[in-house]
Every structure is written in C-alpha cells, then in structure tokens.
C-alpha cells in the first residue's frame, strides 16, 4: 500500500492489476505467480483474502492488498487504471466482481485488460465504464500462445467485438502494427503507451499523441 499512498500524496493517478482470489474476493498484484514479488511459491488465485496478509512484497512490511483497501485509500483523490488479469477462464467472474465492487465508488477510473473477453464483457454488461484493450507485439516475448492468437492480439483484431475506448500498447512495440494508426486516426480511439521509464520516452509518447503509463521518474 505504500506505493499507492505515495501516488495519492503526490497527486498521481495509478495503474494496478486485479486477480480473483479463491474465496471470490479481489487481490492486487502484478503477477499471477507469487515468487517474483513475494519470494514464495504458488498463485494468487489459490489464496483467500485471509492468506494475503502472510505474503510480504519485495522484502518490505507491505502485504498483498485487497482491492477494497486500495479503493478506500484512494477515495476518489486520483484517477485509477484498473487492469483485469483473468486465469483459468474466470474472465466473466473477474469482470463482474470488479464492477460490483466499483458500484458507488465516486472516483474517476477505467478498466483495461490484455484479454479481449474481459473487454467484450464490459461492452455488453457495463458499457458505461471506460474500457481499454492492452496489447503488444506478442511475437517478441510470448511462447505460451499460438501464432494465430499472437497475430490476432498483436494487430488488435478483436477490437471489432470489444470496441475499446482506448488502446494501451507497449511503447517499444507501438509501431508494430498499422492497426494502431487506423484505430487512433480513423476511429478516434485514444492511444496509451506503457510502461515508460524515462522522461525522454514520456515526452516522445506525448508528442506522438499517446498518453503515458510511467514508473520510476517524475514527468
């Protein structure tokens, strides 16, 4: 929670990832696997809400937060970009649970996901929520997907089903597909670049018309 608290204190919006826990609640962590962030084996999807307090993050006193705790802390003070990270086909349940928890929340927020099924769910069930499709050049890093799926996701070909309000594309890959240009220029879909780690990249993204998701510096 320290990073979220500092973001609020400095007036920065924040982006974070949601996972569906074993008991149906939501936990906030980047990876499904626990080892990189906590040093312990397992998946966050196999934990309960009570379990979260037993997993310390990056050798700090912070433990894995609940989504409810983050909403209480922020309390509408800064905007939120909420990423849904489904596992094992739980995209619909994850999307529904997140939206239910956001009912009554007074702050500014949007929801994004790499999984087009989450974005399609939002379009059908909560079209009032700003939704974004996350993407990158999947041919560069991903070995767990078929070439067909890599092609579809890299070139934003699910967008005709999802109709995202914005596309959040990896900064280094932003010129990998003409679909980014088409979506932004012809259909006026806002482009967002992630994750920017220098002021130079931040300035370049803004100059090219991309909004910025950044870390590690003050723009």
Regions found by a protein language model. Name each.
Residues 1-219:
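Phosphate-group recognition and catalysis centered on beta-loop-alpha active-site segments
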